[in-house]
């Protein structure tokens, strides 16, 4: 699927927003409306190599499990996660957070998501609504991120280690 980007402006310094996003355990707090059973893949949840496994709670999704790992870590500008999803983990998933300085002490967060479906059936599922659904969920996630960092509201539970 071609990449799509959603954005939000957070009234916090870029360094603070980056520190929050660099700890993958925090991602469960603002994505728990569509990512369930979020579990860390290692004890160290901060920085390059930190990862998580979760269920994507999408309608008609028969193979909901996915995983992601932070593969690029460029404080305080950019964070890239890569992972796999779908049946047999055959769909490659990439998510990039770009943090741009805004006016005053604000930060513009750009979240770009891209998938590489392996089979025709995976591409068909994307065309039948998965892409639009994922864009809406990511837009909502950034609104929740803003609410958490600015007002300490709408905070979900942090991820824990898989047991």
Predicted features, each with a name:
Residues 1-45, 163:
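Hydrophobic ligand-binding cavity/cleft-lining segments
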Residues 18, 29, 64-66, 80, ...:
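Short acidic, gly/pro-rich beta-turn/loop elements at beta-sheet edges
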Residues 1-9, 15, 51-53, 65, ...:
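Intrinsic-disorder/low-complexity, polar/charged segments enriched in Ser/Thr/Lys/Arg/Asp/Glu/Gln
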Residues 38-88, 106-108, 140-163:
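Glycine-rich portal/gate segments that line the openings of hydrophobic small-molecule binding cavities
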Residues 6-8, 40, 66-72, 83-84, ...:
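Hydrophobic/aromatic beta-strand elements that line small-molecule binding cavities or substrate pockets
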Residues 84-139, 156-158:
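Beta-strand/loop substructures that line and gate deep hydrophobic ligand-binding cavities in soluble
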Residues 13-19, 133, 137, 141:
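Short amphipathic alpha-helical segments
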Residues 20, 30, 72-73, 136:
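Conserved catalytic core of Hanks-type protein kinase domains
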